[in-house]
Amino acid sequence: MLSEGEAVDSIEPYRYDGGPVGVLLCHGFTGSPASLRPWAEHLAGRGYSVELPRLPGHGTTWQDLNVTGWPDWYRRVERSLLDLAERCQQVVVAGLSMGGCLALRLAQEHGPLVQGLVLVNPVVTSADKRLLALPVLRLLRPSAAGLSGDIALPGQDERAYDRTPLRALWSQTKLWQLVRRDLAMITQPLLLYRSASDHVVDATSAPVILSGVSSPDAAEVVLRRSYHVATLDYDAPEIFSGSTAFVERVTTKRNRGLPR
């Protein structure tokens, strides 16, 4: 767990200036760059330019997160996308959980800049009926119990909050609505990793995404040994190698013969 005020290197933003292909990584709600840092370092080691920003309100205290909303988080990843697009010839966007939702929104609003999408346990909806009470509950209670640490592999720490700020959670549901509405705008190649046992994001989001996008090249990979934070779990090596192959495939044609 991330204690209040704790600051360690793994929760800081990560940037690597590599070759002409860039990858933007977006972390999830109440999480931090720590959940994606090994993935970022793997991609950097393969020569890609990498951006892993820290979303506003994250990596400090849950109270800080509760005074932010989805437009704040989106603007941060949007800046990173535009920065990568200035430095690179092609960009692939990837995300974990809410980060996957942000990645989809970037592809919807900046389609020409996004060559492909890699989503790990993305969330765009939920069957949890308790969320129906959020419009009122967010005004009565500041937070609820957190959902961090859903990792099967012992000894892993995603550096996330142990409380869920309810105003911020309500804002996230508004982002879900926008992304679901515009799913048909997604035409980019898409690789979706889904954990068979996920105790944070239920099974409703993946089929909504896969049936809603217009991508002719969309694939789902089921992870059998990992929980929600699969990027720190048993199947992380599969995600790292599979996403690297995906990035190479969707960017190779345009960049063939260019230095890496």
For each predicted feature, which ranges?
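Short alpha-helix in the alpha/beta-hydrolase fold that links the catalytic acid
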Residues: 39, 188, 202-211
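Conserved alpha/beta-hydrolase
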Residues: 40-62
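Catalytic histidine neighborhood in serine/cysteine hydrolases
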Residues: 49-51, 207, 211-229
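Gly/Ala-rich beta-loop-alpha elbow adjacent to hydrolase catalytic centers
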Residues: 95-99, 103
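Active-site nucleophile loop of the alpha/beta-hydrolase fold
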Residues: 118-128
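Active-site nucleophile elbow and catalytic-triad environment of alpha/beta-hydrolase enzymes
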Residues: 165-183, 188
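Short beta-strand/loop motif that positions the catalytic acidic residue
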Residues: 186, 192-194, 198
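Catalytic active-site module of serine/aspartate enzymes centered on a nucleophile-bearing elbow/loop
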Residues: 224-260
